[in-house]
């Protein structure tokens, strides 16, 4: 259970990082 929770947390963090990177790229492209 702990391993699954850790994996889910890591996946969520990776998704958030990807979204942040995409937002940054979009902002840079707009600017």
Swiss-Prot record:
One Gene Ontology cellular component: extracellular region
Main location: secreted
Keyword Ubl conjugation: no
Coiled coil: none
Glycosylation sites: 3, 6, 9, 12, 15, 18, 21, 24, 27, 30
Post-translational modification: O-linked glycans consist of Gal-GalNAc disaccharides. The three proteins may differ only in the number of repeating units of -Ala-Ala-Thr-.
Locations listed in the record: Secreted
Keyword Transferase attributed: no
Keyword tags: Antifreeze protein, Glycoprotein, Repeat, Secreted
Miscellaneous field: The two small glycopeptides are present in a much higher concentration (5 times by weight) than the HMW glycoproteins but produce only a small depression effect. The exact physiological role of the small glycopeptides is not known. The three major glycoproteins (3, 4, and 5) have the same N-terminal sequence, A-A-T-A-A-T, and C-terminal Ala. Each protein is composed only of Ala and Thr residues in a ratio of 2:1 and arranged in the repeating sequence -A-A-T-.
Physiological role: Antifreeze proteins lower the blood freezing point. This fish lives in antarctic waters where it experiences water temperatures near -1.9 degrees Celsius. Its blood has a freezing point of about -2.0 degrees Celsius, and 30% of the freezing-point depression is due mainly to the 3 major high molecular weight glycoproteins in the plasma.
Record's protein name: Ice-structuring glycoprotein 3
Source organism (scientific name): Pagothenia borchgrevinki (Bald rockcod)
